[in-house]
């Protein structure tokens, strides 16, 4: 099936890029926990609102890693294709073996397009995202630009219509900063698997794990194991 071949190709490509990216890098390993809430709320047939907050902590919650908030406006072509433009606020904190010098805020403009499809008992989601990132560091502000590709597959358990498994792969590609091309083309790679429960009203919860490779421009890298606990609740204001 087409989506399966895409996933295999992407995994192979990312594996090769990861192996190259980790050569001669100082790699640190951490354990994190991300607590997340998402919503896509339909206002009309064409328009909706995206809401998101992620409470990212070190360990199981001991200290801050990152606080992330996103809001956006959705435009729906139909129930399986929609685009979003929005704003994100992210505060990053010093943590772990390779801490940043001081906490800083990021203001992010982002655009994305999502497609959804079914292949037998498998449900596929593809997300294509662009980000324009204003990094307000104490040492000076800068702009960075990034592209992201996300593919997720989910499978409903037999005779258990409310339970389903999901897995995703996401690659983060650095485009350029204000003056120069980035020297770490692959900035992040994420691989995740989770078990999910969905109520009849569409609200769902997720518990899973994430393997994150974070590749920095200074020659360092992080390999992080992360617990994921998420809630998705979509509101529908259409008549």
Features from the language model and the residues they span:
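Outer-membrane beta-barrel "beta-signal"
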Residues: 110-113, 223-239
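Membrane-embedded beta-strands of outer-membrane beta-barrel proteins
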Residues: 37, 70-71, 111-113, 149-153, ...
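Start-of-domain marker
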Residues: 23-77, 82
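Residue-level signature of outer-membrane beta-barrel architecture
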Residues: 41, 75, 115-117, 155-157, ...
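Transmembrane beta-barrel strands of outer-membrane/channel proteins
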Residues: 51-55, 85-89, 126-132, 167-171, ...
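N-terminal signal peptide c-region/cleavage motif recognized by signal peptidases
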Residues: 16-19
């Amino acid at each position: 099936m087409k989506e399966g071949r895409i996933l295999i190709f992407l995994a192979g490509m990312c594996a090769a890029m990861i192996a190259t990216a980790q050569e001669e890098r100082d790699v640190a390993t951490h354990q994190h926990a991300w607590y997340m809430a998402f919503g896509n709320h339909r206002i009309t047939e064409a328009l909706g609102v995206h809401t998101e907050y992620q409470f990212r902590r070190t360990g199981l919650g001991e200290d801050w890693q990152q606080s992330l908030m996103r809001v956006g406006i959705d435009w729906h072509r139909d129930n399986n294709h929609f685009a979003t433009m929005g704003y994100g606020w992210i505060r990053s904190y010093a943590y772990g073996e390779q801490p940043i010098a001081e906490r800083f805020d990021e203001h992010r403009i982002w655009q994305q397009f999502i497609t959804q499809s079914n292949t037998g008992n498998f449900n596929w989601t593809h997300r294509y995202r662009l980000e324009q990132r204003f990094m307000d560091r104490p040492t000076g502000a800068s702009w960075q630009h990034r592209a992201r590709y996300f593919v997720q597959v989910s499978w409903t358990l037999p005779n258990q219509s409310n339970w389903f498994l999901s897995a995703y792969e996401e690659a983060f590609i650095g485009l350029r900063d204000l003056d120069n091309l980035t020297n770490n083309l692959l900035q992040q790679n994420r691989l995740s698997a989770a078990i999910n429960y969905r109520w009849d009203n569409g609200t769902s919860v997720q518990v899973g794990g994430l393997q994150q490779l974070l590749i920095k421009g200074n020659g360092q890298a992080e390999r992080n194991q992360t617990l994921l606990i998420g809630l998705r609740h979509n509101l529908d204001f259409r008549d």
